[in-house]
């Protein structure tokens, strides 16, 4: 008798995706992050669902409802901090996953890569709206500043901002709709994840060498399921340590002050995972220019497959490109640091230099160095 997992219409899909899936035998731990992101998404949906049962999306009660969750609900503080720090863990895994794709040339699978970019935008939008919900000072002013950026769009900008706000300022209508979208988007993300996997399984996984591995495949289960479980344990250990020992480490103290439209915080900044993009936004003195640079800092990922000039897919045998890649990583860390600093000398010039370098490395230096490596191969 044939195994039910190979004949049942539903189980057959699971089987071909997670059990009998042929996978390259050389996959390193850098390939763990896809499954870690799946765990993060599941955790966020689960904790978010229970938080939504106690949260009220009204400007008068939102802040108090979060306090109520932490103080009065059984293990409410665990749910709240798992959700907040789970978002940080989500972005750590997300950025490492994208970095892996850049380093090993996974962007040549353009359908999977493009769906990944859409996913990145969707997760960023969800995280931004989630940050507004506790209705602290940084929630309110973050929402005001970031939504206001849309007013830089010529002609329709001001109307667009007021349409998003549901009034003439960030208020009750804004909070209610942000809660609605924050609840809805993770389910849209889940659907996009399935499309992401569908496209991935059309081509099969890339591998560290960048050389086709059709002749050397192993079943996903048990080899990579066990490997993924190790990743789960390490990530959940790190997340548990963060939640139980230092839950506010990555948060902003200003968000423990209820939102007050009459009192602007001295330094408005988003969560740490948006600081690199925020630094790029601030480094351009022109409002529209800053907004375009902000969008392009993420959208530039879509251009990368088009400017891949190397004859090799992966960077593993390309030392010059490796140097540029790690320079880009250092540049992004610098931008993240600058995004959290006040707008004053010398941070302004450092931010502007790092922003120029970011686009310079990706758009000009990487294609040039790749072409040079092709030339060196002839020797």
From Swiss-Prot:
Coiled coil: none annotated. InterPro entries: Cyt_b/b6_C, Cyt_b/b6_C_sf, Cyt_b/b6_N, Cytb/b6-like_sf, Cytochrome_b, Cytochrome_b_C_euk/bac, Cytochrome_b_N_euk/bac, Di-haem_cyt_TM. It is found in: Mitochondrion inner membrane. Binds 2 heme b groups non-covalently. Disulfide bonds: none annotated. One of its GO terms (biological process) is mitochondrial electron transport, ubiquinol to cytochrome c. It comes from the Eukaryota. It is a multi-pass membrane protein. Its cofactor is heme b. Gene3D superfamilies: Cytochrome Bc1 Complex, Chain C. It holds the Pfam family Cytochrom_B_C. This is Cytochrome b. It comes from Mormoops blainvillei (Antillean ghost-faced bat). The gene is MT-CYB.
